Amino acid sequence: MSARGLVKNYAMGGGEVRVLRGLDMELNAGEMVAIMGASGVGKSTLLHIFGALDRPTRGEVLYREESLFSRSDAGLAQFRNRSVGFVFQFHHLLPEFSALENVIMPGLLGGEARRDVGGRAEALLERVGLKERMEHRPSELSGGEQQRVAIARALMNRPELILADEPTGNLDSGAAGLIFDLLREINRSDGVTFLVATHNAAIAERMDRQAVMVDGRIAAKF
């Protein structure tokens, strides 16, 4: 996956705010890349565009050598549901549903029958260490457990790419380290590509590459 000349502007107060300013980036299959930079520099915007949650003002994203945004709205929805998993700083779990029901949801939205997705969801929750917590609602789980549910949910439709926006930002250092260990294990065992926006330098250093954003562009790579 790659970005070429990405520009993203937002209308604000009768004017325009430029967030991305001609950003170029390559993301190779199977690698784990950290995006770092000050708040407001465009990290979340970049992830939203890579995940087809938002469109660039100019520029293009190539996925399998095809221009992603040449797809129809239905094609973009299919891409989001089948090819990409999302993990956010705040887990965005549905509070009225159990952990298991939250993990099942992407499969149901993808058109699968509950009987076909239930076993897969249970296996994912067991994999992330929540075998005994499947029937608990989010309010009955710790912050680290909630994020584990969110990771299981992101894996439900077997994505090639996971976009994680500050996935450890709301956790203490111990829980953050455990969550990163889990993401790394998934990356290595399943070959899932990760693009992770983070302020945590210690976690970023454990990834394959780090890219630093300044003024809406990639300013440095390590």
Sequence positions of predicted segments:
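ABC family nucleotide-binding domain
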Residues: 1-214
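Conserved switch/coupling elements of ABC/ABC-like ATPase nucleotide-binding domains
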Residues: 215-221
